[in-house]
């Protein structure tokens, strides 16, 4: 694989270590496995990204896991962390799947220093101080730009990527699907989100599309997206401390499992109302609760099936 540095990435911290894979590493343990070397090394790595101009003053760290694979056609999947902003843990949770399916794991960490709350991360920075921000400043834009950087570095020649997010990351991912143009995404997997922006206009943004930037005539292309809702069947705790309990959120269901199903059924109903083709899918994972490590193998399998069908 021809891996080279590229001059336009302003700030880059290169990291690597050759270690055995593990799914339960803590943030500190994975950091210990990282040492300075070339861009996107084998095993664990990280780099600092600030090359998207509208957000260049708000750099983020991107963690990676590269399996033992030397061809330049390695598939890429973005893995989005939850509200704890622990991207390195998420990368560790995906290491075994990376080796099994030979996929590059890319885990951006949307840090609290520059993106301090759910409005900046889970909601994509769309709506701050009671007003919509400029679309070019939405954090959704980081994904395609990081992917372009990886392509330009000659790490891979693939033209598309997958994206998965768990919990708060699932919130980011389903809004990424609704409010950005994910033309390079081959599969979009929101998993175990705490609450949703529903794909209808009966609720006001951010709980629905009423008063949002998404016009109803755009729903046709949104319902054609390769979106797969992935839910842990045991993610049913109505008293979870981090579960949003506003009236609008409670109308979606009493726990994450119910809310995920509601997100799917309301979108399907809206598509039927408008006589639109509906490509979204929903899958449940037995014996798994609110756990990224528990959901990762099923998400990786869904991504691999997408690769096999293309």
Listing of model-derived features with the role each one plays in the protein:
Residues 95-100, 177-184, 300-308:
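Short, surface-exposed basic-aromatic patches at helix termini and helix-loop junctions that form
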Residues 264-310:
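C-terminal catalytic histidine-bearing segment of alpha/beta-hydrolase fold enzymes
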Residues 83, 233-236, 287-289:
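Acidic beta-to-alpha connecting loop that harbors the catalytic carboxylate
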Residues 109-113, 194, 288:
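Short beta-to-alpha linker loops that shape the active-site pocket of alpha/beta-hydrolase fold enzymes
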Residues 53-63, 73-160:
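Serine-hydrolase catalytic machinery in alpha/beta-hydrolase-like enzymes
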Residues 1-32:
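Bacterial Sec-dependent N-terminal signal peptides
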Residues 23-76, 86-89, 131, 135, ...:
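A domain-start/cap signature at the N-terminus of enzymes
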Residues 186-272:
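The feature captures the conserved acid-bearing segment of alpha/beta-hydrolase catalytic domains
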């Amino acid at each position: 694989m021809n891996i080279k540095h590229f001059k336009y990435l302003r700030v880059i911290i290169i990291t690597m270590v050759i270690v055995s894979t593990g799914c339960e590493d803590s943030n500190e343990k994975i950091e210990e496995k990282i040492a300075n070397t070339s861009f996107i090394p084998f095993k664990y790595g990280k780099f600092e990204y600030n090359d998207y101009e509208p957000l260049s003053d708000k750099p983020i760290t991107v963690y990676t896991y590269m399996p033992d694979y030397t061809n330049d056609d390695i598939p890429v999947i973005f893995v989005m962390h939850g509200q704890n902003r622990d991207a390195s843990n998420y990368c560790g949770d995906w290491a075994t799947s990376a080796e099994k399916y030979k996929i590059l794991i890319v885990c951006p960490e949307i840090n609290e220093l520059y993106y301090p709350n759910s409005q900046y991360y889970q909601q994509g920075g769309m709506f701050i101080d009671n007003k919509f921000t400029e679309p070019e400043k939405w954090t959704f834009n980081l994904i395609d730009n990081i992917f372009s950087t990886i392509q330009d570095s000659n790490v891979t020649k693939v033209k598309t990527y997958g994206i998965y997010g768990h919990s708060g990351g699932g919130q980011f991912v389903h809004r990424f699907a609704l409010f950005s143009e994910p033309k390079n995404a081959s599969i979009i997997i929101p998993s175990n989100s705490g609450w949703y922006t529903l794909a209808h206009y009966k609720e006001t943004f951010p709980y629905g599309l009423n008063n949002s930037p998404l016009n109803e005539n755009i729903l046709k292309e949104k319902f054609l997206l390769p979106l797969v809702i992935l839910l842990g069947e045991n993610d049913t705790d109505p008293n979870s401390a981090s579960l949003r309990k506003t009236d609008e959120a409670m109308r979606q269901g009493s726990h994450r499992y119910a809310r995920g199903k509601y997100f799917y059924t309301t979108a399907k109903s809206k598509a039927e109302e408008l006589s639109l083709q509906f490509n979204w899918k929903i899958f449940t994972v037995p014996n798994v609760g609110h756990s990224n490590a528990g959901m990762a193998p099923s998400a990786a399998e869904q991504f691999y099936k997408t690769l096999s069908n293309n």
